[in-house]
Amino acid sequence: MIRFDNVSVTYRGGVKALRDIDLTIEDGEFVVVVGLSGAGKSTLLRALNGLVPATEGSIDFNGTEVVGASASELRKIRSDIGMIFQTFNLSLRTTVLNNVLMGRLSFVSAWRSTFGLWPAADREMAMQALERVGIVDKAYIRASDLSGGQQQRVGIARALAQEPKVMLADEPVAALDPITSRQVMGDLRRINQDLGITTLVNLHFLDLAREYGRRLIGLRDGALVYDGDIADVDDDTFTEIYGRAITEEDLMAGVELAGHGPDETSDG
């Protein structure tokens, strides 16, 4: 279980990124977080794994306090959290399999990973992760040869190889075309359903949030302004969260109608 208790984050210069967040996420939930740019979505995820320190309040991660945690405690917390990034964060010059094996770093000695002497069990786990996202046939090619959607699937497989209790996806489809975005969101939803991994996804496109989410969290100016079941969400809900009317730019359907997206190449 994850619990935020009166959590605030203030950056240098006095910018308050999170304001008095009270939030509980149960094991196995699939939660979508929405809000305008600067609303605090990324800060919420980064505060959970200790990348951004909370300046007030407490964060409980499966019984361990994140705020003020020691270096060893933070390493343990982060080993239980798989991160998926908007920019993929892959090593493009090496193979897809080697990228996924990076998710096993906390389980092997430094010399083994340095020389690529991964245990057979770790290699098998990495291949299973690639199988789960549908690109096991790409295991031995360079990551640079993949499309954007395929690279994001490698990122998901790498997080999955970590055997996480929680997966955090920060705008995972922001750089992808509409078809590929739905494929990636489908992968995340299926992993959550099949493996019961608690999943938090930051999204910009509100129709994707409605299509794939089960619970919706809305942030505005660092404050929690909505928390409820996705079945109860309508356009008025999003207007309330954003503090303005919804535009085509807020919808994946708007991108489709415009006839283009950030990543023109769909990878099937």
Predicted regions and their residues:
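Conserved ABC ATPase signature
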Residues: R142-L146, Q150
